[in-house]
Amino acid sequence: MKQYTVAVLGATGAVGQEMMKILAERNFPVGKLVPLASARSAGKTVKFKGQDVTIQEACDSAFEGVDIVLGAAENDIAKKFAPAIVKAGAVFVDNSSAFRLDPNVPLIVPEINPEDVKWHKGIISNPNCSTIITVTAVNALNKIATIQAMTASTYQAVSGAGAGGPIELQNEVEALRLGKTYEPKVFSYQIAYNLIPQIGGEQFEGYTSEEMKMQNEGRKIMHLPELKVSCTCVRVPVVRSHSISVSVYFDRHVTVEEARQVLKDAPGVKLVDDLPNLKFPMPLDTSDQDIVFVGRIRPDLVFDNGLRLWCCGDQVRKGAATNAIQIAELLVKE
């Protein structure tokens, strides 16, 4: 099998580290790994398949000879280096939001729209974490009845805000236990024993940027340009794995049993739906997994053509790193 030179842009961050871990787990054909980060991290090493690999400073020349670049950096870094990556002849699989809504850039969840990889022009975007988890859960239903609208409430883990999120939660819990105060640095308010119903800045009619991603990205991934989504995104004091409560509205009546049968066989999905025996998806059970768990399927009591469901998924893996590497796997199959 052909071996590929793979660069990880943002190799020292949580998603970048997870990408390298998953490359090894999935036996991706890496001939050479090129970890890239800021100048202050250059010269340090990361582990890959038991070997120490030296981190290089991210610069335009670092992409020469690279086949695939996995992006785990912020928007500004992605925008800065994208031209050099494309010029070098590499394919940039980018986890930032910089190019997601660009009509010339595919936005891909491999279980849903793998065919879109064929029209890339050097850049492929990885969707937002909560969007990936949600659309992976509902897309199978769209194959038996067209989804017209969705409402969603997300319960997003602190690690979704970066490595500092879990540290801040732990520090706040400890400070409260000791009767001390702790000034939040990562979140706008105390997250311990609290919920923060705001992720991202205001973007449209009181909706945040994170909330609008569910509609705008969902439309592009599922090829449903008229899809309407109303979403509320909430940060919760959970370390890892996002959860989403979703109401889905179809162009016809869909029974609970129909939905269960379809979801039972859906790629990337595990059905966990047995309320009498207290079997349903929970963040603790879905962490460090590469699939989306779906349960609590029931009729919507307001709209005749609606279903409600609950899904959970690891936002660092399927919501980011694993999805990006699945995209890279599509590239090497071409």
What label would you give each PLM region?
Residues 192-239:
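Oxyanion-binding "anion nests"
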Residues 118-125, 194-205, 309-311:
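Helix-loop-beta segment of a Rossmann-like dinucleotide-binding subdomain
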